[in-house]
Amino acid sequence: MAFCSPAMLNYNIASNFGDSESASVRQTSSPSVLWSAPGHLSPLTLHCQSSLLYAEQPKSPWCEVRPLDPVLPVTRETLKRKTNGSDCTSPIASNPGSKRDAHFCAVCSDYASGYHYGVWSCEGCKAFFKRSIQGHNDYICPATNQCTIDKNRRKSCQACRLRKCYEVGMMKCGSRRERCGYRILRRHRNSEDCMGKTKKYNEAATRVKEILLSTVSPEQFVLTLLEAEPPNVLVSRPSKPFTEASMMMSLTKLADKELVHMIGWAKKIPGFIDLSLYDQVRLLESCWMEVLMIGLMWRSIDHPGKLIFAPDLVLDRDEGKCVEGILEIFDMLLAMTSRFRELKLQHKEYLCVKAMILLNSSMFPLSPEEPESNRKLHHLLNVVTDALVWVIAKSGIPSQQQTTRLANLLMLLSHVRHASNKGMEHLLSMKCKNVVPVYDLLLEMLNAHTLRGQRKSPVTHPEFEQVSHFQV
């Protein structure tokens, strides 16, 4: 067995420490230089000793107690193994039932570190939920709010991750069961107390928000609307000659992009996010086409005979002839734009009118189970109306003309609603004829419009929770 000795493997310690040829030997990190050569082990075993420290049986020479044991770092795992009398076996091997007893994160299916916020969860999801409930929760899903949340993709979409946290039962008052030694009755009582305190806190916070909203001046409210304005969206202009498919493809792509920005715009309106989620979504579902159209009119107000869909998509009436049934809608849009031009619509007036369209859009009863949200909505409508009256008064025209101007602006909203219904019917027709595919948020908005038309009564809250694009 001479060929297995450390001398053959250059692990021997040179006697002459001044010799330059032995420098590399002294720098070796192999701990075998400190022990006598186990003649019955192969060179491969000597080079794999770090893994064998946990894999060999206790009878292995590597597990014998030696004077140089303190050279190894003493860690918590090392002490645990020594206490269990198995210094060379892995924790899993020493406890065959550990895998069976392991818990998994209810959100991402990773190994759970404990019982956090009412469910078993990992450290990552626990920290994410903690950040979210402390105020950092203005997340928007860039897709269809159906992203897969697992160990590898949990960071890809914060909105869907937070939605899943709530779906699996995470809550602010969740107790850590593994650290709780109380009886079940006491745990329930503590939970009820916590929920009661949370309810009182939420009610107090709501009153504070209402007071703050009522004290906001019309000027401050209009400035907030100005800051909430979404950016211009670009879309590639279809190449000529225009076809029905290419034109509709450009328009639907533009609408889908604008819908994403519309959600962010609505959430920035003071008081909107204080409404119930049910009411927020119903309002947006009811007015999205109107908001898109009045934005189109505002962009086109200084361009007679043109419709400025986007900075890089400018169309006139004749260019719409390639799409069946769209000329009637183009004529309505051009006529309303001309009327706004005659009234010399100001930018701040446009901001207030657009917010009014959103807040006054639902023709169905809002959440019957949350009358508080309905009351907030009416209060918010009064705030927007006051802001519009203030903007008109700031123009300097006489009081009688101010009343007339307010009436003229409000009367145009019914025409915007009529054009919106025509546009919705046309888009549904194009979709049913397979002229253009409709995806993502635009598709869900269309489906919601169709379902609402087929229903005689508004949706119930549990059913509606399936529509989750606006979950934060």
UniProtKB/Swiss-Prot annotation:
Which Pfam families does this one have? Answer: ERbeta_N (PF12497), Hormone_recep (PF00104), zf-C4 (PF00105)
GO terms assigned for molecular function: estrogen response element binding; nuclear estrogen receptor activity; nuclear receptor activity; steroid binding; zinc ion binding
CDD domains found in the cross-reference section: NR_DBD_ER, NR_LBD_ER
The segment annotated Modulating runs over 1-104
Q: Name one GO cellular component term.
A: nucleus
Q: Where in the numbering of this chain does the NR LBD domain appear?
A: 217-449
Q: Where would you find this protein in the cell?
A: Nucleus
Q: Keywords on this record?
A: DNA-binding, Lipid-binding, Metal-binding, Nucleus, Receptor, Steroid-binding, Transcription, Transcription regulation, Zinc, Zinc-finger
Q: How does it assemble?
A: Binds DNA as a homodimer. Can form a heterodimer with ER-alpha.
Describe the function of this protein.
Binds estrogens with an affinity similar to that of ER-alpha, and activates expression of reporter genes containing estrogen response elements (ERE) in an estrogen-dependent manner.
Q: Provide the domain comment.
A: Composed of three domains: a modulating N-terminal domain, a DNA-binding domain and a C-terminal ligand-binding domain.
Stated name of the protein? Estrogen receptor beta
